[in-house]
Amino acid sequence: MKTFPRLPDRGDFAFQMLVAPYRTSGAALHDLRGFYGPHLSKTMPFGTVRDAEGHMYTMVRSVNSPTGTPNQTRFIYQSTRVDGQTLRMDKPRMAATAQTLMPTRALEADTARWTSLDGEPGTPWRLDASGEHMRWVEEGLMDLQGRNIGPGMQWLLPGVDWGTFYLSQLYDVAGTCEGRPVKGIVAVEQSYMAEGGQVHAKKCLIVNNKKHVIWCAFATVYTDGSIDAGTFLVGHENLGFAFLVNEKGEVRTTTDVEALVSRDDGDPFIKHVKLTVEGGEEWEFLPDPKGRMVDFLGGHVPTAQQEGRWQRVGETRTPDHWFAWGEGDRRNGTARNVLGTEA
């Protein structure tokens, strides 16, 4: 049962959340209508793929909405091939792509499409997404496509002056990066914010209030064809949920979730996470030794981003391909209502 050590004001629900699956469609992804007050801010494709040598490639594009506030950074591309040590931004390749402020938008059959503008500087890009498939092309750099993993996820976090409505759809993808065959996972997410809001930056209830301890979208495809996928979010007061989906498309959700985050002294990156769902089901986050996204530190996104893998404690299945793009902030602490430091 939830408790309220801090008595909230009217309209303040002490960071309680609603979470559920939803039926993803191209029409829904294309729609510009708002929900519960917030407006569509942007669409965010992002993911991690690996090649046969084990090198990682991660990418994210800010696909701005006409009703949103544009990000300064439009496209980020990282790989472990830059320095061989960890994920680093490949700035020459990033700079070569079109830095589209406001993309073209179209709905073809039931596929939403966003593209760069004809004639703008940089190499063209295109994103297609629906409830069944996606394809993401950054011309001359990468071409990824694949099928959906289960239904989409939606969560709502209300606030007194502004809240957040957030959606995510995961896809099992394969293709090429830098001409090399790769496979992995891509998420296509959409954030709905108050006017002028940006997730992670402005009018963001979670980040601006330093509330989250761990936030991570993930998926693991095992060699036997089974899948574990979803999102974990745990923070202070009543913030948090678990959304879990398997290869059959069966979904489980709960807001009864706790986490304990471990870090080495002075290290912004996570060493290990033990997460408990509804008091009994235990999961753990295993960071990739080369998964630290060091070039994010001090940038638009203030939290330490890293790649790894989630699994149930005691898991015996063999993973084939996976992603777990997670984030935490040592300033926010190590567990619910266990605060961190500003250092």
Question: What does each model-identified segment do?
Answer:
Residues M1-A343:
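Targeting-peptide/extracellular-domain and disordered-appendage signature
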